[in-house]
């Protein structure tokens, strides 16, 4: 779904048992946070946003932390995707410890690319 209005309507209709946000379709971090809060209000658990693409694991790990620390306080029934490739292009790549994403230690979104990786794939047309 593309926005909080659609999520709210589906939540009001009782359609979801579990909600998984697509971080690439919604309007940024604020929208994702709002969708977590809406789901919590309606008693629907959220699995963190899809992480199946270049840089998406780095981008969505923060939302899993936000859910645990500020919304649900739950780890037990939360599942997050992990794609084990192309992390070498990022300054702060995602790390997995004991089957869980390791909390980021640097500020920011976590999707800062290494300069050499950006230059390698830069369109030179």
Predicted segments with their positions:
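C-terminal extensions of enzymes
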Residues: 87-125
């Amino acid at each position: 779904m593309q926005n909080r209005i659609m999520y709210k309507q589906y939540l009001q209709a009782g359609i979801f048992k579990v909600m998984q946000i697509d971080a690439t379709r919604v309007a940024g971090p604020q929208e994702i946070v709002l969708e977590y809060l809406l789901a919590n209000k309606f008693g629907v658990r959220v699995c963190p946003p899809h992480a199946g693409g270049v840089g998406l694991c780095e981008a969505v790990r923060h939302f899993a932390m936000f859910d645990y620390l500020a919304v649900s306080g739950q780890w037990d029934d939360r599942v997050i995707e992990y794609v084990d490739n192309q992390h070498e292009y990022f300054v702060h790549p995602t790390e997995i410890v004991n089957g869980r994403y390791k909390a980021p230690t640097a500020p920011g979104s976590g999707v800062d690319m290494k300069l050499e990786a950006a230059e390698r794939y830069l369109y030179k047309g």
